[in-house]
Amino acid sequence: MPITDLPQTLPATSPDAASDVASGAALGAAIQRFAPPLPLAVAFSGGADSTALLLACAERWPGQVVAIHVHHGLQSAADAFVLQCVKTCAQHAVPLKICRVDARHAPGQSPEDAARQLRYATLIKAANEPWPAQGGVPMPAVRSLALAQHADDQVETLLLALSRGAGVAGLAAMPAQWSRAGLAWYRPLLDLP
């Protein structure tokens, strides 16, 4: 979609709002401990948490970080988040892929579960597709993917699982690292509030 087709209003988030994720020192320490195989793709919603993660990673590994935005179209502000992602990535010279998906859920499936499954499948597909050359240099294949979930997200997920009567497996904590579809996946902000 051409940028001109997007709405000109932005959701109430900006790179400055990324300070809500954690203090700069805590974020910096988390990124210093984070050592993914490069190149790295960041799942980029355009919200404060993923903006903080993307900018910190792009600063630490210039030219080795790309962003993937999955547009579910489930929120009225979805197109505005696309615009936020486009602007942020352009300002920081981070390659961006915008993936539009149909997040309708199947009968008996929760909308959240359908959106999550589709989002993960889309992230895998986008990460594995070729990326445009940067400055005439071909971009190597993405080797790892980072998600901006943090401790508050983990608590929210646990409470949601409890409210749905989840068993022991459903109450397990979010992993900070795992492998899936040939990619190393990370949640480097999981220890941050």
Please place each PLM-identified region on the residue numbering.
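Core alpha/beta nucleotide-donor-binding catalytic domains of modification enzymes
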Residues: P2-P193
